[in-house]
Amino acid sequence: MEGGKSKMKKEDFLNKLRRNTHVQFDMPAVDVKGIQYEDTLKQFIEMTESVGGHVIEAKEGESLDELVKKAYPEAKVFASHLPEITIAQKNPDTVAEANDLNGTDVGIVRGEVGVAENGCIWIPQTMKEKAVLFISEYLVIFLEKEKIVNNMHEAYARIEMDPKYNFGTFISGPSKTADIEQALVMGAQAARGVTVVLV
């Protein structure tokens, strides 16, 4: 109790609403046809680059560790929980708290769905500390080419939450913010740069 008022967690509040909802209605069927592309891979690469990201197509058998080091030769501190990455000094699954990821030069994660329409990549939280997505100076996202879809409608039909964490986010290039004068600043609030590695 703080100030005489009890605090209610979001999930408790939503569960209380669900218990007290006596009449439910099915969602209406809406036939939405999203934009389609002849070449989703080409469109995805173009959109990713247009929003300030970089794209590297990994060659078969190429070392992902070496590929990341080549992309960021000045980086000293890498963070990843992916088993195929052996250069990481920090692991978001084993750090004591999110703050321990501070000072990460390059965070390395895996995306599950890429969207050709806008260059977004769906990244479900599969690690204990999701801060690696936002606290890293630069972010490397591995994405399988076969997981690129045309539009957000197709993407939402495919996304799944990890039941352990129940969180995910779409990321499209480096962080961006713009003021009322429409001056665009990249990297002010999260990753200063994003590299998508297509595997």
Which role fits each region the language model picked out?
Residues 2-199:
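The feature marks the mature, well-folded catalytic cores of soluble enzymes
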